[in-house]
Amino acid sequence: MEWSREIYTFYINFEVVSLVPPSFEVLPDPQVIFTVENLGVILASFLLISAVAHFVIAFVRNKNYNENLKKGMNPYRWYEYAFSSSIMIVLIAQFLGIWDLWSLVMIFVLNATMIMFGYLMEKINQYPKKTDWSPYLLGCISGFTPWIVMAAYFIAALGSGETEPPTFVYLILLIYFIMFNTFSINMILQYKGINKWKDYLYGERVYIILSLIAKTALAWLVFIRIFASF
């Protein structure tokens, strides 16, 4: 697929203006570190991570998986999401115009941290009668931050008189903000024990379906964007 993004660093340089009196300027110095290409490989990566995780759960760690389900937890889910969803959100960030290397690193880490708070939520709430929502709330903070940053870039693009974000950008921002939050809603329904979510296994099935939809939808949206240019 013909697609590429140059990834920058924005370190600063100090330029001496005069020695007497001492004076200098601080100037940003954007440098291209590398170019992200091979979009097909990136799209395949999070799908492959998910496939490998499901293979391991089904054939290698199935006994542990079933034992954990009885305790109301699935750590393997969170391990997989920490990588696959973080790759997804970094890719989305690049489509929205975030090309600074360290901003992308922070987005990846913040998203992965949010996911591991989900793991912690299940781990510490296996047995208590009263649910401890601290990991959930902390996860919301770390997980919501990248979306604030991406929304800021999107709004800045809207405010520019020279450019207009393509329809694809509107779609991907809206669809994936909704998709990412459905995972959070699923967790709330599980721990509140609402209707069918009283059964932990029902929530587990919902996670599997949501994961499949999110990954497949992103892959197709990107494919359509590249070939149809909408």
Q: Where in the sequence are the language-model features?
A:
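Polytopic alpha-helical membrane-helix bundles and their juxtamembrane interface segments
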Residues: 1-74, 85-230
